């Protein structure tokens, strides 16, 4: 079985949507937890301040953060990020 960047992007997006649904459920039960606790923790995990461009490690957190926002990320953009990151990490 060959996993492509497109497959991986769709998988990341699906997992992020599932996690966003859990976060929304928590927000419905405990108002303010999303903006007060969860989003700051995700921003820290995604290294938004110290890495302007995502690394492979940061990408899942960044996809989840994007999913929590108003503009849902598209699989094509995530695919481009994965392809760029994998090309950058190939040994010389």
Predicted segments, located by residue:
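Residue-level recognition of alpha-helical structural elements
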Residues: 4, 8, 31-34, 53-57, ...
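Amphipathic alpha-helical interaction modules
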Residues: 19-55
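Short amphipathic alpha-helical segments and their helix-coil junctions
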Residues: 1-7, 41-46
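Long amphipathic alpha-helical coiled-coil
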Residues: 2-30
